[in-house]
C-alpha cells in the first residue's frame, strides 16, 4: 500500500478495510475502482452507493498534493459505466497559482482520460468552488449531474449553478466527455505518438487549438493529458495538468519523470509550450520536447 493511504485506511470500518486491502496493495494503485469492485465493496461493507462514496473520500483526499495550502480536498467521479475515479487537488511550487488543479477537475479529468463516456455523480468533501461548478458545466451530463456533499442532501449542478452560462450559450454541441478524434497522424516514437493521441482527444471548441502531453517515467510508464477547454475560458484545464494528475494519482512523484513531450499546432491561436516547459522545469524535468501537429 502506498504510504499516503495508511492514515485514512486505518480509520475505515474493519469490513471495508478487509475488502479494500487487496485492491490497495499495489503501490501504484490506479486511484479508480471498477464497477465490479464497487459492487463488492458495497456488499461487503453493507453500504449503499452514496454511503460508500463518502466512506472512501478520505482515500481520495490522501492523493492531494498541497505544498502551498496544506488543505486537502478529495473527490470521486462516478461514471455512467459504474467505475469510480478518485481525484484530489494539486498545487505546484515554483509555478503559478493558475496551474493548480482542483479536486473536482482532477476526478473528472481522471475519468475522461480513462475513457469514461459520462458522469452520473460527483462526491466531494467540501462544497465546490465557483471555478469547479463552471468546469462541471462543460460536461455532457450538464446541469443534471448529481453533487454529493457530507451532511447535505444530494443536489444537482443546476442547484449549485443557477442561471448558468455554458457551452450551449455559445452554440457548442460537442461537450466534454463526448468522444472526439481530431485525426492527426501518429508519427515518431512511442512517447511522441502518445502525445499526439492525447491531442486528438482534446476538447477545444473555442480556440480550435488541440494539444496533448505525454510524460514518461523512469520505469517506462507513460501518462498522458488532453486539453480541456471551458466556455468561461479560465476554468480550462491544460494538457500538462491532466498528465501530472494521472501520474500523481497512480502513486508516482515528479522526480520519476524522465521525459516529456507536448503535441500542438505551431500556428494555433493558443500555444501551450511556454507554460508547459516552465511548469515542468519547476518540477525538475528538463528533458522536454515539442512535436507539431500537421
Curated annotation (Swiss-Prot):
UniProt-listed GO biological process terms: cytidine deamination
CDD domains xrefs: cytidine_deaminase
The EC number(s) this enzyme carries: 3.5.4.5
Chain ranges of the CMP/dCMP-type deaminase domain: 48-168, 186-294
Database matches in Gene3D superfamilies: Cytidine Deaminase, domain 2
Pfam families linked: dCMP_cyt_deam_1, dCMP_cyt_deam_2
Binding site for substrate: 89-91
Catalytic residues (UniProt): 104 (proton donor)
Record key words, sorted: Hydrolase, Metal-binding, Zinc
Cofactor annotation remark: Binds 1 zinc ion.
Domain of life: Bacteria
Binding site residues for Zn(2+): 102, 129, 132
GO terms assigned for molecular function: cytidine deaminase activity; identical protein binding; zinc ion binding
Enzyme type, top EC level: hydrolase
One GO cellular component term: cytosol
Record note on quaternary structure: Homodimer.
Entry similarity comment: Belongs to the cytidine and deoxycytidylate deaminase family.
The protein's name in its UniProt record: Cytidine deaminase
Gene: cdd
